[in-house]
């Protein structure tokens, strides 16, 4: 029988062992990123999801949940100092609300955590007119966008109604799927970021991309933008190229019903200046590129002179992307690629379209009214300028999108 002192030693040993395990688990997640702010985002999301996993899920959200936040300040002198800043702050806005939204959008918190923390987010060369920067999670399922403090305030203004709308439509919407909003502070640099589901696919590459507002004034991509590998083209580019979206009557009806409902909701909130983001996947082009890629890999393996074969390490993030059963070219999982629509059988090319509403946080306030007056003077009252009131904006937007679907 163990003596009291032996029992105490045993308990102490057990506690020590537990602490050691906890320390090792922390070291596995190094949150390596070239930008310290990204390292802090990875750390913060990991910390937040771990904390939320211990909180009981409430039956319903309370008004205070829409004002709540959690924040933590870290003075990090010893642990993982090669990868993490010495001092940083992380703040999460409305954690219970965003957890509920993730659930309603069919996103598991563990999967969300893995996507944002297992490997560093990847920079995206898209840049909004506001100067916002974008990253995608390493598995391309989520988009991380820098936003302004005004955007954070507007998000708080609409969050309760947005959440209610998502509840009523059962998460079936073309609106951005807001999944988390954070403030990061490193060495005196403070940024705000919002995480949304990626409109585009994690596996079907997009070769053409458009940002459409239904306006024709100053709605053409710049020469600098067009020089990019995947430029963001605009309304006049779409019209001048004779581009069309070829979807069948059934998909068209479903899409336009969702779009109309979403846009009416935005008009009620006095929101405007949003866009329809359109991405086009060319099935035959993707197949051809895959064949060429495989041929090149075969040549490289043949020239490697018995060196280690080229491949993905067993524990690398790359292996998580294709854990689901393989899909045929142009096929997709509608639970993951929620914005994807196939072209109809008579389309000139076999394509898959990804379409969703983006950038919904612009409120029609005094500034927008002034901009509208100035542009009306410059371009004339009949010009299709983008700064019109929310009702006009929504009507013109719906008319334009209705005409490009065929």
Curated annotation (Swiss-Prot):
Q: Which superkingdom is the protein from?
A: Eukaryota
Gene Ontology cellular component terms for the protein in this record? autophagosome; cytosol; lysosome; nucleus; photoreceptor inner segment; photoreceptor outer segment; plasma membrane
Q: Where is the composition biased (Acidic residues)?
A: 289-304
Q: How does it assemble?
A: Homodimer. Interacts with PIP4K2B; the interaction may regulate localization to the nucleus. Probably interacts with PIP5K1A; the interaction inhibits PIP5K1A kinase activity.
Entry-linked CDD domains: PIPKc_PIP5K2A (cd17309)
Give the molecular function GO annotations.
1-phosphatidylinositol-4-phosphate 5-kinase activity; 1-phosphatidylinositol-5-phosphate 4-kinase activity; ATP binding; protein homodimerization activity
Name of the protein in its database record: Phosphatidylinositol 5-phosphate 4-kinase type-2 alpha
Q: Which cysteines are joined by disulfide bonds?
A: none
List Phosphoserine occurrences by residue. 14
Q: Which UniProt keywords apply?
A: Acetylation, ATP-binding, Cell membrane, Cell projection, Cytoplasm, Kinase, Lipid metabolism, Lysosome, Membrane, Nucleotide-binding, Nucleus, Phosphoprotein, Transferase
An individual GO BP term: autophagosome-lysosome fusion
> Where is the stretch described as Disordered?
287-328
Q: Which residues carry this modification: N-acetylalanine?
A: 2
Provide the primary localization.
membrane
Which InterPro entries has this protein been placed in?
PInositol-4-P-4/5-kinase_C_sf, PInositol-4-P-4/5-kinase_core, PInositol-4-P-5-kinase_N, PInositol-4/5-P-5/4-kinase
Using the UniProt annotation, give all residue ranges assigned to the region (Required for interaction with PIP5K1A).
59-65
**Catalysed reaction per UniProt?**
a 1,2-diacyl-sn-glycero-3-phospho-(1D-myo-inositol-5-phosphate) + ATP = a 1,2-diacyl-sn-glycero-3-phospho-(1D-myo-inositol-4,5-bisphosphate) + ADP + H(+); 1,2-dihexadecanoyl-sn-glycero-3-phospho-(1D-myo-inositol-5-phosphate) + ATP = 1,2-dihexadecanoyl-sn-glycero-3-phospho-(1D-myo-inositol-4,5-bisphosphate) + ADP + H(+); 1,2-dihexadecanoyl-sn-glycero-3-phospho-(1D-myo-inositol-5-phosphate) + GTP = 1,2-dihexadecanoyl-sn-glycero-3-phospho-(1D-myo-inositol-4,5-bisphosphate) + GDP + H(+)
What sequence ranges are listed for the domain PIPK? Answer: 33-405
Q: What is its EC number?
A: 2.7.1.149
Which compartments is it annotated to reside in? Cell membrane; Nucleus; Lysosome; Cytoplasm
Q: Which residues carry this modification: N6-acetyllysine?
A: 89, 145
Under Gene3D superfamilies, the record lists: 2-Layer Sandwich (3.30.810.10), Phosphatidylinositol Phosphate Kinase II Beta (3.30.800.10)
Modification after translation (UniProt): Phosphorylated in tyrosines. Phosphorylation is induced by light and increases kinase activity.
Notes on how activity is controlled:
In rod outer segments, activated by light.
Modified residue annotations for Phosphothreonine: 3
PANTHER family linked to this entry = PHOSPHATIDYLINOSITOL 5-PHOSPHATE 4-KINASE TYPE-2 ALPHA, PHOSPHATIDYLINOSITOL-4-PHOSPHATE 5-KINASE
């Amino acid at each position: 029988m163990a003596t009291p002192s032996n029992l105490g030693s045993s308990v102490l040993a057990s506690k020590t062992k537990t602490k050691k395990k906890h320390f090792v688990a922390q070291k596995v997640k190094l949150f390596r990123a070239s930008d310290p702010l990204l390292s802090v985002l990875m750390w913060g999301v990991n910390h937040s999801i771990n904390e939320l996993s211990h909180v009981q899920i409430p039956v319903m959200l309370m008004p205070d949940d829409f004002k709540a936040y959690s924040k933590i300040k870290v003075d990090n002198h010893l642990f993982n100092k090669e990868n993490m800043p010495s001092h940083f702050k992380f703040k999460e806005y409305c954690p219970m609300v965003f957890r509920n939204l993730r659930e309603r959008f069919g996103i598991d918190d563990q999967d969300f955590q893995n996507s944002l923390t297992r490997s560093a987010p990847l920079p995206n060369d898209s840049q909004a007119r506001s100067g916002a920067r974008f990253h995608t999670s390493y598995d391309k399922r989520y988009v991380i966008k820098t936003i302004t403090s005004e955007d954070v305030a507007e998000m708080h203004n609409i969050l309760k109604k947005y959440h209610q709308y998502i509840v009523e439509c059962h998460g079936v919407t073309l609106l951005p799927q807001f999944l988390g909003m954070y403030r990061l502070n490193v060495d005196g640099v403070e940024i705000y970021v919002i995480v949304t589901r990626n409109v585009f696919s994690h596996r079907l590459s997009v070769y053409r991309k458009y940002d459409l507002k239904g306006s024709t004034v100053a709605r053409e991509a710049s020469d600098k933008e067009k020089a990019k590998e995947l430029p963001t083209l605009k309304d006049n580019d779409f019209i001048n190229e004779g581009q069309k979206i070829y979807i069948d009557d059934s998909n068209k009806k479903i899409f336009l019903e969702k779009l109309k409902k979403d846009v009416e909701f935005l008009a009620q909130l006095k929101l405007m200046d949003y866009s329809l983001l359109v991405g086009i996947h060319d099935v035959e082009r993707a197949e051809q590129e895959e064949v060429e890629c495989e041929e090149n890999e075969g040549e490289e393996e043949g020239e490697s002179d018995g060196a280690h074969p080229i491949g993905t390490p067993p524990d690398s993030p790359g292996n998580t992307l294709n854990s689901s059963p393989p899909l045929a070219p142009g096929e997709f999982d509608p639970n993951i690629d929620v914005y994807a629509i196939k072209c109809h059988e008579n389309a000139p090319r076999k394509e898959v379209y990804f379409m969703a509403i983006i950038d919904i946080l612009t409120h029609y306030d005094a500034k927008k009214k002034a901009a509208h007056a100035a542009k009306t003077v410059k371009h004339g009252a009949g010009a299709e300028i983008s700064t019109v009131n929310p009702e006009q904006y929504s009507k013109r937007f719906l008319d334009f999108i209705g005409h490009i679907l065929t």
